[in-house]
């Protein structure tokens, strides 16, 4: 998709081991600009998840990702939002494969790398259609892409870092993915974060899910994961 020379130029901002990953990172970065350059998208969804943390809070991302996690800000039909997302991405990424589950809609865009060996890659856009609230509000953060292949910028609607980490804590408790622990460790040791607000956001999201978790229960849950090789084996993806 992207000329090799432009992929090489992108290495200064995307320090990944393979050209295919650099190419995919450029595609993901352009997708963010295209999405939030569309008012119909920017006004209706907020950016969340590990990609949001690494792309908007770190000068150099600490983890490779192929996912764009969005949250529908207000309750309402999801159809117009999906149409706006596709209007931003389909013209240059093609038609996505769409899946719908409980509380979420996923669109997967597939493409092949230009760099050899040619590899199939994907960008996954997932919209949470359930969490229609923000504990600490939504802020706008600038995001810039400056590449010979594509240049652009957008103000991206995103949760505050404490709320992003609070939802990461929820993810760490509810699933077995080492990247959740890695993201929390990196952010808490590298950024200025109010720990109490992180815990408060975690509790608020659990309440929204109808759950209550004690510290002892959380520690037992985490200790069980730390004994699992699959949890520890791939913490960065």
Stretches with model-predicted labels:
Residues 47-52:
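Glycine-rich beta-strand-to-loop/alpha-helix junction loops that act as flexible
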């Amino acid at each position: 998709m992207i000329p090799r020379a432009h992929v090489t130029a992108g290495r200064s901002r995307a320090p990944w081991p393979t050209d295919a990953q650099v190419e995919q990172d450029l595609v993901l970065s352009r997708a963010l600009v295209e999405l939030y350059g569309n008012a119909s998208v920017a006004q209706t969804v907020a950016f969340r998840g590990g990609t949001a943390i690494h792309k908007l809070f770190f000068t150099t991302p600490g983890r490779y990702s192929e996912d764009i996690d969005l949250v529908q800000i207000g309750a309402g039909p999801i159809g117009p939002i999906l149409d706006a997302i596709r209007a931003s991405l389909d013209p240059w990424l093609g038609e996505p494969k769409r899946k719908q589950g409980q509380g979420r809609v996923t669109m997967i865009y597939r493409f092949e790398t230009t760099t050899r060996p040619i590899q199939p890659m994907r960008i996954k856009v997932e919209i949470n259609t359930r969490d229609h609230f923000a504990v600490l509000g939504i802020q706008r953060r600038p995001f810039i892409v400056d590449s010979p292949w594509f240049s652009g910028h957008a103000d991206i609607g995103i949760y505050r870092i404490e709320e992003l980490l609070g939802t990461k804590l929820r993810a760490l408790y509810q699933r077995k993915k080492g990247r959740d622990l890695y993201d929390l460790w990196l952010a808490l040791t590298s950024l200025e974060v109010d720990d109490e607000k992180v815990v408060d956001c975690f509790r608020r999201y659990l309440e929204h899910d109808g759950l209550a978790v004690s510290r002892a229960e959380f520690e037992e849950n985490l200790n069980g994961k730390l004994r699992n090789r699959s949890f520890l084996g791939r913490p960065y993806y």
